[in-house]
């Protein structure tokens, strides 16, 4: 054994045999590196100094002269970026609206525009012909390429209650949710005469509430319905007065079974924004908040329904983008206003779903993700992220500056409250900031920041570390406090510090450079660059698990005498540790063989290599085997006995 390495080692067989001490050579003590430098500050995400939607949601009304303009209606303001593309004939919520004068605000008389782009008086003026032409052309192309299966999905998402439709985003929990909510739909097939007859869902949308006798799930249904307060898209539609795509171009092919759903009153049937999208995203995001174990999947389902409005030929991409933006604002405002109801609904939802799935808190997450992609179309988180990004922009190129810093709306951190219960409100705001969409896309650069929020990406944790990022997880609280995964590719110059007793798994191609310190809990590497490009320092109460498919690389590695390192070796390079600089390690080293890998006696198993190796493990445990260490100045392996 090299004089560069001193081992006081216990090589244990996990079948119950008594371990035998194996002692290495003594060597002079090595100066132990210090933790990565403390940046001395934490990141922040202040709200813009503008009237906040959550403080003004009650102004999202039509038929009230007090709330009929851009300045006085919060819903209209959320999507005011549309005014750079299209100027309505009148800047009032007045399409088909009459309202008396009130409190000094002038009476509202109905707009005289026809709602038809080719019939005077038209409802507005095109200011950006390139973007608006692309907006409608997208629908032409989509509807002409539409498959029969897509047409069927678009029909159901149009005619069914949105609260019912989006519940299939629950995956393996869908049946339990619908049973508990007592949800029903009367539209289980597309009738043969649907091309001439308008069918209306006579089901109950979100289900049966507490007042109707649903003791097990009524609070959940009540809360979902409560989230629709002040959520109407009609004020926005009647302000912007922008036509549906099939009125702009006859080349748009509405799903034949939805032709009877076309409104014969174009003057009051604006396309911008999509009401179906706004309601679906609001319902889906609320359900995601109540069951964060399916958070990303539920938000993805809401966005899918929005895209199906384009597939149907009923809406354009900008209509759907605007609907998503209003949904985020309304959900934030109502979660804030009805927070106590939300917490009660959260508790009831879990109790009911645990009972109906015969699970416990410790097994519920696994059950919620037990179905393969063939049975759960939202099972692939990578695909969810890609689809969300596509559905946020629908192929539009930026038309404004690309590098404006993100702004997080006031109160928006509540959207992630149950998804990241171990993060502070400020930290959740920073998560939203660091995962936001780049600036410059049509209508999405609103003053508050609703348009750029990428909620699907935010559900995967930070996108960037700036300054100190201290995460404290209490495993005793269960759920995400006990174990969580961050999948984003994290950049920045900040430092990550893990505290507490929970397990945090990092799986992105991370580039953060400020280093990583594990003061408590378990930090797991699920990718080769999980720990960024800085130093990794493990304190006496800390534990690191290397469980990536390829060797994990760090700049330097230090572990104190009571620390623990686990290597999950798969025989294909996974589970190994590569340190570009010095490795100074104490504590316990646990080696496991995973994914069916079963080495044989006599095999030499590489574990780690470093620029320089100074390992002082108090014991090495090789699960299922007896072994002895084989080391050099830069490498450590074990030979199975």
Can you say where each PLM-predicted feature lies in the sequence?
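Alpha-helical transmembrane segments that form the membrane-embedded catalytic/substrate-binding core
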Residues: 276-280, 311-339
């Amino acid at each position: 054994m090299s004089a560069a390495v001193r081992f006081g080692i216990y090589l244990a067989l996990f079948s119950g045999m008594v371990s035998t001490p194996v002692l290495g050579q003594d060597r002079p003590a090595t100066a132990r590196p210090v933790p990565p430098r403390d940046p001395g500050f934490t990141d922040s995400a202040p709200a813009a100094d503008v009237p906040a939607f959550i403080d003004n949601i009650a102004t999202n009304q039509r038929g009230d002269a007090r709330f009929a303009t851009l300045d006085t209606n919060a819903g209209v303001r959320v999507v005011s970026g549309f005014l750079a593309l299209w100027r309505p004939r009148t800047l009032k919520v007045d399409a088909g609206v009459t309202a008396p004068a009130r409190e000094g605000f002038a009476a509202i008389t109905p707009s005289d525009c026809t709602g038809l782009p080719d019939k005077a008086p038209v409802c507005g003026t095109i200011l950006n012909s390139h973007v608006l032409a692309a907006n409608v052309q997208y629908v032409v192309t989509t509807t002409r390429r539409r498959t029969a299966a897509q047409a069927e999905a678009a029909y159901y998402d149009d005619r069914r209650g949105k609260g019912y439709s989006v519940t299939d985003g629950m995956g393996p929990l869908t049946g339990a949710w619908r049973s508990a909510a007592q949800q029903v739909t009367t539209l289980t097939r597309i009738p043969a005469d649907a091309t001439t007859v308008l069918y209306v869902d006579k089901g109950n949308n979100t289900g049966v509430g507490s007042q109707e006798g649903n003791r097990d799930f009524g609070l959940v249904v009540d809360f979902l319905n409560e989230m629709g307060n002040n959520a109407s898209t009609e004020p926005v539609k009647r302000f912007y007065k922008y036509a549906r795509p099939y009125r702009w171009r006859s080349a748009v092919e509405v799903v034949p079974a939805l032709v009877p759903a076309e409104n014969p009153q174009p003057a009051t049937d604006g396309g911008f924004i999509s009401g179906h999208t706004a309601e679906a995203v609001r319902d889906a995001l609320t359900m995601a908040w109540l069951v964060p174990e399916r958070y990303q999947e539920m938000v993805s389902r809401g966005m899918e329904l929005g895209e199906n409005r384009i597939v149907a030929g009923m809406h354009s991409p900008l209509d759907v983008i605007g609907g998503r933006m209003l949904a985020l604002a309304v959900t934030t405002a109502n979660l804030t206003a009805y927070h106590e109801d939300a917490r009660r609904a959260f508790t009831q939802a879990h109790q009911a779903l645990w009972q109906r799935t015969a699970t416990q808190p410790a097994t519920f997450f696994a059950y919620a993700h037990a179905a393969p992609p063939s049975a759960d179309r939202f099972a692939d988180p990578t695909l969810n992220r890609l689809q969300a990004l596509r559905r946020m922009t629908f192929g539009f190129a930026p038309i404004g500056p690309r590098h404006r810093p993100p702004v997080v709306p006031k109160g928006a951190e509540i959207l992630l409250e149950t998804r990241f219960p171990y993060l502070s409100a400020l930290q959740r705001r920073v998560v939203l900031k660091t995962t936001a969409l780049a600036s410059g896309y049509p209508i999405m650069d609103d003053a508050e920041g609703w348009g750029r929020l990428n909620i699907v990406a935010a559900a995967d944790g930070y996108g960037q570390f700036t300054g100190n990022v201290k995460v404290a997880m209490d495993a005793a609280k269960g759920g995400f406090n006990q174990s969580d995964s961050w999948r984003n590719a994290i950049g920045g110059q900040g430092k990550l510090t893990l505290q507490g007793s929970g397990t945090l798994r990092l799986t992105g191609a991370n580039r953060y450079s400020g280093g990583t310190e594990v003061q408590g809990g378990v930090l797991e590497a699920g990718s080769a660059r999980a720990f960024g490009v800085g130093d990794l320092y493990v304190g006496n109460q800390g534990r690191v698990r290397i469980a990536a498919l390829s060797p994990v690389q760090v700049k330097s590695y230090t572990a104190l005498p009571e620390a623990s390192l686990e290597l999950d070796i798969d025989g294909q390079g996974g589970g190994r540790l590569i340190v570009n600089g010095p490795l100074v390690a104490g504590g316990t080293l646990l080696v496991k063989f995973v994914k069916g890998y079963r080495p044989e006696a006599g095999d030499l198993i590489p574990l780690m290599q470093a620029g320089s190796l100074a390992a002082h493990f108090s014991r090495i445990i090789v699960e299922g085997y007896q072994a002895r260490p084989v080391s050099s100045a830069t490498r450590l392996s074990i030979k199975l006995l």
